[in-house]
Amino acid sequence: MRILNQITARLSTVALASVLSLTYVQAQDTKTDSEGSDKEEGNRNVMLNASSANGPREIQIGLPSADVNVLDNGLPVTYATNPHSINSNWRSDASLSHVGLLKISETAITTGNIGYAVNSFTQLGQEGFNGRLDYKSNHFGLQEFSLNLNGSMGKGWYYSTSLYQDFDPGTFKIKSTPFQDRTQIYKAALTKRYGDGRGEFTAMYHYSNSHPVYNYATQSAPFIYVGDGSVKEYGDFRLGTTSYLPTENNITYRDMRTGQLKQTTLYDAIENHSSEVSLMNTYKWDNGLTWKIIGRYDNARGALVYQTPMSLINVKDNNSYNYVLRGVDGQLTPYTGEYVQTRMSCLNSGDIDELLFTSELSKKFSTSTLRVGVNEWYYDIDYTSNTTMYDQSVPSDGSYPVRVYDSNKHSGFFYDFNKNASEYYKGHENKLALYLTHDWDITPKFNVYYGARFEWQSLRGENAAVKNSNGEYVGRFADYYIGATAPDGTKITPTPLSYDWFNYDFTAALTYRLTDNFGLTGDFTYIVQHPRFENFSPATLPNTDKISVPLGRAGIYYNNSWLSLTSLFSYISKTNNNSTLNLQHDGEIMAAPLTYDIQTIGWTTDVMAHPIKGLDIHFLFTYQKPTYKKYETSVTFSDGYEGKINATGNIVAEIPQVLIEFDPSYMITKDLKIWTSFRYFSKTYANINEAYYFNGHWETFGGLNWQVNKKLSLGCTVVNFLNQTGAKGSIAGAELITKDEAKQYNGHLMTGSYLRPFTVEFSASLKF
């Protein structure tokens, strides 16, 4: 969890003003009785993703995201995304009848989570026989198929079946497996519809099996940091199309539960599977009262694997190292390369049982809608993260890296089992919540929306935050496991956990139409949470004080026959973010837990225009300033060096202060559409101390969509058509580097994440 916390808290920390970038405010929504309705944002394709070929894009709100919020039929796809990720259990495919984006206020009230939520619904059976077959490919060899068949069986009974198959080799070949994503999902639903349109009852089964190898295969790559915000490629290594993953697929680890040394493959370690049973019922009365209820049980194995780059060592002509590699004949030979990359392998996995239940009762009046809902969500997990260190070559000729080891220190490839970032927790978490909302048109010009959520959260179980006889945390050490003995003589036994908290959320939005075209709007959401079970995975207990998130927005909107404009100022903050940094010094890794706050102010202007027939233009401009508050921590390394970080007042790492989106599209004919999408991200800092930075870059998309006839549609999409290459995100092992120290590393080799390469995608959809 330490590595996941660090990645999530920094890579997912994003700018506030994009809260508004999902565009129209409530005053501009068109209310319908559809699945999406006025609870959703418009104007944004959440599946147009520059970071992934098969997942929804990250929705930016200016805070470290605890989880990606994706709802399926009103329930979270997974209760927690570590170790059971969204993409391993859900795809936007032919099995869905609707995919939208819930507003922040709706997400907060109905789930208690922070941020937008992708909102999806299953395609249930319809009259007659119906089918939809979707296909997608790209020039790297992706093969993705999705099929839904549904129909009627008579007497009000309907069926729906779906399958999804993904064979994705990624943008570069790896030796350990032919695919960087091998996912299969199957669904079957049986629906009974009541007479007179009263509603329906559905029973559904869902099975998924996924190996998201891309999670670790695309995690990092080497590049030369120039010093002016740009990077150069290292020799013949091509960012995004050359593999930085060693050829070997096996991994040795020490089981956190038993202490046994075990061996597996990375492909097997990242296997996810899930078996779900869902029951859904909707009933409508003549007086406008509607009752919706859904329950789901999920038995799953969740897994995430990280191959996190740590130290990058120049070993050329350095006699203190004696790195060797093993040939195909088993013989050891000296390693003659210039650099060695140390990696921490994190094998996260857990056996999971989820029982999620939501019930809503709503009543429509002439000028308002009142809703009352209940959540009862139960989550049981037995989780470990087994960690292993190993070293690899850093080839400059574009060849595959191989594992190496320093024979002066080790006798094999793997070492420091569970010393860094190993994790353990077992038990259950329960959330019982009552929520209500009221959407009221007080006058034809004045709308008020308000709501509240009251949540009882309980947590019972155990973890491995062990203290010694002096009351000090033991921390992790080499060959750590439950039952081991620490260097100071402390026996490692699980620490019992028992917590009960009261959480609450409030939201209110006001919209006033000054004229038929112009108006004022504002909204405020206040969320109070407490730590979730996964926050108890490190070697120290988290700060269990309340986490408060106030979000306020205010501005104007203007609409006419060809233009819609929204301009708003925003503020959001979050207290008591729990995180753990893995700080590095002279090849040693030390965990540094900390609790910090974040504050973001921003301004967003969003325009949707239809200047001439067939031409649509969307433009978004965001300025934001996300800053750390109370961000201080330190650790003392074995040589006595004290590593300190004080980032209070710094701009949040990896977050641009300026974002621009420009999305024009034109209907060449009534069946042929050409479109482009440009997204600009300004300069971002690549470490917490603002010592390294990356220049701004564009993410670009373009495509042609052809509706051949009523049954068949074809599409071609080009990702990164400007063919920009370079680095993004953070630089591995750079947390302690200061601005003054950074200058000496200009022109040095470093590792980090990178932009998605130029990709041509083809798609087809057939309805029958």
What is each stretch, according to the model?
Residues 3, 21, 28-128, 527:
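Acidic, small-polar-rich N-terminal luminal/periplasmic segments of exported/outer-membrane proteins
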Residues 28-30, 683-685, 706-768:
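C-terminal beta-signal and adjacent terminal beta-strands/loops
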Residues 130, 156-159, 196-201, 288-291, ...:
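Repeated loop/turn-to-beta-strand initiation elements of outer-membrane beta-barrel proteins
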Residues 135-139, 165-169, 194, 207-211, ...:
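Transmembrane beta-strands of outer-membrane beta-barrel pores
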Residues 215-261, 305-345, 391-420, 460-497, ...:
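Solvent-exposed loop segments that connect transmembrane elements
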Residues 352-354, 364-379, 384-388, 392-410, ...:
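Structural signature of Gram-negative outer-membrane beta-barrels, strongest in the C-terminal barrel
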